[in-house]
Amino acid sequence: MISRTLLKRSLPTVQFLRPFTRSSIRRSAHEEDLVNLNELPRQKSLEENYVPLINPTEKYKVQIEELHKFGTYIMACLPKYVQQFSVWKDELTIYVAPSAILPTMLFLKNNTACQFKQVSDVTAADYPSRTNRFDVVYNLLSVRHNSRIRVKTYANETTPVPSITPLFNGANWFERETYDLFGVFFEGHPDLRRILTDYGFEGHPLRKDFPTTGYTEVRYDEEKKRIIYEPLELTQAWRNFTVGSSVWEPVGEGKDFTPESFKLPTPEPEPEKESDEKK
């Protein structure tokens, strides 16, 4: 009986010792595979890692020269339509009038040196201070020559731009998106209607004069169990902040850190003019 009790008391110690001894054996076995950090090569100095900045004109020097030649070639082929061209880095942009869009696109699509048979994007940019406030931008891709070109024209709120959908079927939805977001009309488009905004939407969201909050509020009405449109209600009344004013209310007297040499002298009050009765 005594031997059995001693054996039972010794068992827990054996159970705790076995995993400890195994882990020590594993640790000693893997110590040979560990890497000595002191023997690793040191990191290079900052001077060796420093890469000098390269001027973009030098980096794209070869491409810029070739694009200038290609732009000159297009102007020589279409002197009646192409007004000018510009090159920035590896991008060529030609500028045409709205009436020259179709013949220019036809030339860029079918000419052997061009072969721009794919429309990547059609978009616009809004410049409200200009007479023709919209720049309509066409991005074309030539798979055969692995090159791209950008065509720009101009328009306003009432002047339409000829649609290139008869030449490029892929421009259908691009022109609808440009009409929806900017309000540019494309003459000859087979289905010129909104594509992103909701039915009955007012205005064009990407115009610079379009308010950030929009004109109406769209929400789900629990009583009517449907989406409803309501006039927009702002939680704060509209305020016109003049230059130099702060949106936050000042607290305390405040401190002026402007040096004395930069401060303007306080003007003296003008003398009061005597009235005609006193004279």
Curated annotation (Swiss-Prot):
One Pfam family from the record: Complex1_30kDa
Region of interest called Disordered, as start-end residue ranges on this chain: 249-279
Topology of the protein relative to the lipid bilayer: Peripheral membrane protein
Cell location: Mitochondrion inner membrane
GO molecular function list: NADH dehydrogenase (ubiquinone) activity
EC id: 7.1.1.2
Disrupted gene: phenotype observed: Leads to sensitivity to both cell wall-damaging agents calcofluor white and Congo red, as well as to thermosensitivity. Also increases the sensitivity to oxidative stress agents H(2)O(2) and menadione, as well as to osmotic stress agents sorbitol and KCl. Impairs the yeast to hypha transition. Increases the phagocytosis rate by host macrophages and causes significantly less damage to host oral epithelial cells.
Protein induction: Expression is down-regulated during stationary phase. Expression is repressed in the presence of nitric oxide.
Transit peptide: 1-27
Annotated PROSITE patterns: COMPLEX1_30K
Cellular component, GO annotation: membrane; mitochondrial inner membrane; plasma membrane; respiratory chain complex I
Keywords in alphabetical order: Membrane, Mitochondrion, Mitochondrion inner membrane, NAD, Oxidoreductase, Transit peptide, Translocase, Transport, Ubiquinone, Virulence
Catalytic activity: a ubiquinone + NADH + 5 H(+)(in) = a ubiquinol + NAD(+) + 4 H(+)(out)
Main subcellular location of this protein, as a coarse class: mitochondrion
Regions of compositional bias (Basic and acidic residues) in chain numbering: 270-279
Presence of the UniProt keyword Amino-acid biosynthesis in the record: no
Family: Belongs to the complex I 30 kDa subunit family.
Quaternary structure and interacting proteins, as annotated: Core subunit of respiratory chain NADH dehydrogenase (Complex I).
Chain's role: Core subunit of the mitochondrial membrane respiratory chain NADH dehydrogenase (Complex I) which catalyzes electron transfer from NADH through the respiratory chain, using ubiquinone as an electron acceptor. Plays a role in cell wall integrity and is involved in osmotic and oxidative resistance, yeast to hypha transition and the ability to damage and invade oral epithelial cells.
Protein name: NADH dehydrogenase [ubiquinone] iron-sulfur protein 3, mitochondrial
